[in-house]
């Protein structure tokens, strides 16, 4: 029997956890890979470990990539740089970590190659996002082609959240029966506070705004999700 395998790039945050629960519904064997790059919100690594165990996935690999910290100066890799909602002179937020998704997706692909997975799943998004260039659809598709050529194997990059806004991402978690798990147990906050977070950093504001919109109009947001994704309709309370 052909076993369908996937590798999820997993931070323990809202987006990657939503991708994980979706992957568990569609693949026979799900692996997760988490990266320790010296991030200031290091609690996310332990959050990822706990959730991986809770969901009973096939394997969870935590990789030390702190070398990225030496090269990528960002508010997420330097405690002395305060997180700011303002854009820098280059038009990017100071939470952008140069090369992060290039490295993560490349290493996840190597891991997928080793375990025989057909897909690498990442929660990047171009709809409600922080302006990071390595979250764009164009980038993901380009790197996917390069990686497949370099490995001489077709490993498919899946981006299930790419065209969903944050409200629709909450709807997707709800569709798979894990709205409260994602809300209460994931860590998205740049200040390392799980659940609803600090409420003031850019990540928390984006997450909270999406949740409020979803809770105010579940039926309407879910209808949009069905239209965008082609998921079969089912009752969501």
UniProtKB/Swiss-Prot annotation:
CDD domains: QueC-like. The gene is queC. It catalyses: 7-carboxy-7-deazaguanine + NH4(+) + ATP = 7-cyano-7-deazaguanine + ADP + phosphate + H2O + H(+). Pathway: Purine metabolism; 7-cyano-7-deazaguanine biosynthesis. Binds 1 zinc ion per subunit. It comes from the Bacteria. Zn(2+) binds at residues 189, 198, 201, 204. The keyword Phosphoprotein does not apply. It holds the Pfam family QueC. PANTHER family: 7-CYANO-7-DEAZAGUANINE SYNTHASE. The lineage of its organism: Bacteria, Pseudomonadati, Pseudomonadota, Gammaproteobacteria, Aeromonadales. Catalyzes the ATP-dependent conversion of 7-carboxy-7-deazaguanine (CDG) to 7-cyano-7-deazaguanine (preQ(0)). Belongs to the QueC family. This is 7-cyano-7-deazaguanine synthase. Keywords: ATP-binding, Ligase, Metal-binding, Nucleotide-binding, Queuosine biosynthesis, Zinc. ATP binds at residues 10-20. Its cofactor is Zn(2+). InterPro entries: QueC (IPR018317), Rossmann-like_a/b/a_fold (IPR014729). Its EC number is 6.3.4.20. One of its GO terms (biological process) is queuosine biosynthetic process.
